[in-house]
From Swiss-Prot:
Binding site for L-methionine: 60, 103, 250, 281
Listed pathway(s): Amino-acid biosynthesis; S-adenosyl-L-methionine biosynthesis; S-adenosyl-L-methionine from L-methionine: step 1/1
UniProt keyword annotations, A-Z: ATP-binding, Cobalt, Cytoplasm, Magnesium, Metal-binding, Nucleotide-binding, One-carbon metabolism, Potassium, Transferase
GO CC, any one term: cytoplasm
Alphabetized Gene3D superfamilies for the sequence: 3.30.300.10
NCBIfam families linked: metK
Similarity remark: Belongs to the AdoMet synthase family.
Lineage summary: Eukaryota, Viridiplantae, Streptophyta, Embryophyta, Tracheophyta
Primary subcellular site in the record, as a coarse category: cytoplasm
Gene it is expressed from: SAMS2
Listed name of the protein: S-adenosylmethionine synthase 2
Catalytic activity: L-methionine + ATP + H2O = S-adenosyl-L-methionine + phosphate + diphosphate
Amino acid sequence: MAAAVDTFLFTSESVNEGHPDKLCDQISDAVLDACLAQDPESKVACETCTKTNLVMVFGEITTKADVDYEKIVRQTCRDIGFVSADVGLDADNCKVLVYIEQQSPDIAQGVHGHLSRRPEEIGAGDQGHMFGYASDETPELMPLSHVLATKLGARLTEVRKNGTCPWLRPDGKTQVTVEYYNENGAMVPIRVHTVLISTQHDETVTNDEIAADLKEHVIKPVIPEKYLDEKTIFHLNPSGRFVIGGPHGDAGLTGRKIIIDTYGGWGAHGGGAFSGKDPTKVDRSGAYIARQAAKSIVAAGLARRCIVQISYAIGVPEPLSVFVDTYGTGKIPDKEILKIVKETFDFRPGMIAINLDLLKGGSRYLKTAAYGHFGRDDADFTWETVKPLKWEKPQA
């Protein structure tokens, strides 16, 4: 590629599972999993907040499930690695508060007619608009800046838990700046411009050791060599000290990492968070089906890059609008792609839940609550399954 090519920089960030906001997302989704495992018809809107030595779970839950909320909170904290006050939270000795009420009967009758409606008649749990996005720049059909930031965060946790870097503590953040070329609307990554990692650590390790270990055990296994060059900038724990972390360092809240959960700043976002919400909440199920639609468009070769928007009214099953934009990369006009999308996908919330098997609990939603909801290679991420789209290439 000629040196004179016009390029731009784009940055995405991520946080790993020990970040206080992500801790809250995981607790909220662990509660959702527990409810759905016993009662697939559970209606869950579970929020979590945390600060030093305290976790509070609150919201509206209507379920036949017998759920020990405190036990779920402590187990989730323990699994992440919050096992003593000096790492940011002590799972076994912190205070756990639970304030859970039933779903409002007004909402219940409007959305699912107190369970009397057939799946295709179930209305959206609220108004709102959701987006799905896909780009052919990575095998996952996701933005490279987001994929790399997310994988660095996941790798930080991996080398902490397997003992490769015993000085690591649970909290940490990553950020990746990629230099891109705009090829007629498609995004072509050229190189990684900057890598930033800020990770919590214990008292024993030096900044030089941190930098060396992060380069060797985190960055090298994650970022393909072809994207790194002698000009790539590394900021590794640039503040110089990050011993106090987790809820001890910052308060945490469910739903505060919605860009990390989705596309790293690419595409668009309707503003609704995912974690702690059952599939009647279109903030979640609508965003999942929109991702499947966008990914299927790109996978079919209909476009190199695509965004899909859908919108809903509370209590109404059919979406109010569906929008497709291929940024000028479409092989056929966007309005024809939109027609194919409407014929292929059922955007009614009750049918999304069935077609994507969203009423299954276990650890299904907990897995989504750290390291992104999209671009993951896992059978539980059913919305990542590409649906075949029927179309004919225009004659040359």
